[in-house]
Amino acid sequence: MTIHYPNGQQPVQHYNTHNELPTPHQSIYAKRGMSLEDEINHSNQYYLARHIAVIHKKPTPIQLVKVDYPKRSAAVIKEAYFRRPSTTDYNGVYRGYYIDFDAKETRNKNSFPLKNFHPHQIQHMRECVAQGGICFAFIKFTELDLLYLLPASNLFKYWDQQQNGGRKSILRTDIAKEGYQIHYQLNPRLPYLNAVDKIIAAKA
């Protein structure tokens, strides 16, 4: 099936083969091949199953262009287009707070390029924060296997500096200083709600 983004680019497809929660005897090392998206989905399943939080990946509406019907009981989508650019990757509810965040990866070792975000994503997060929501970004340095949660307020600061002629990237040292490092564990894979608890405490 061919799916087109609004800007004409082809999408990068991710396949989640980890639909079940891990049992205690499973090794963390067995999951090193998981994508960041899979790791987040896996963690969200853990939180949902234990009634801790309800957070899901956002579906993106598509417009069907070509559909084949090889059988009466089955339809095969041959071509489709995303109707509009996506905002952020995930949203949900935790402790009565609206949660909204995006997940980004970079192969750079020392900085994260701000071009990985789009203006409409930043604007969406600003609007959510203005309504009392909690927004942040997962930023993973894949070559170093380091993952951070950066609160939206810090992301906005660097975004605005870039717009005013500042750096076009965020130094990893600054992300480590202003964000929260997420350490991998067995269950949940990414215990990121611990960092969200700190963001909530700072709001009080």
Curated annotation (Swiss-Prot):
The keyword Hydrolase applies. Mg(2+) binds at T87, D89, D102, Q121. Binds 1 Mg(2+) ion per subunit. Its cofactor is Mg(2+). Keywords: Cytoplasm, DNA damage, DNA recombination, DNA repair, Endonuclease, Hydrolase, Magnesium, Metal-binding, Nuclease. GO terms for molecular function: endonuclease activity; magnesium ion binding; nucleic acid binding. It catalyses: Endonucleolytic cleavage at a junction such as a reciprocal single-stranded crossover between two homologous DNA duplexes (Holliday junction). Gene3D superfamilies: 3.40.1350.10. Residues 7-24 have a biased composition (Polar residues). InterPro entries: Resolv_RecU, Restrct_endonuc-II-like, tRNA_endonuc-like_dom_sf. Its EC number is 3.1.21.10. Residues 1-24 are annotated as: Disordered. CDD domains: RecU-like. Belongs to the RecU family. Endonuclease that resolves Holliday junction intermediates in genetic recombination. Cleaves mobile four-strand junctions by introducing symmetrical nicks in paired strands. Promotes annealing of linear ssDNA with homologous dsDNA. Required for DNA repair, homologous recombination and chromosome segregation. This is Holliday junction resolvase RecU. It comes from Limosilactobacillus reuteri (strain DSM 20016) (Lactobacillus reuteri). The gene is recU.
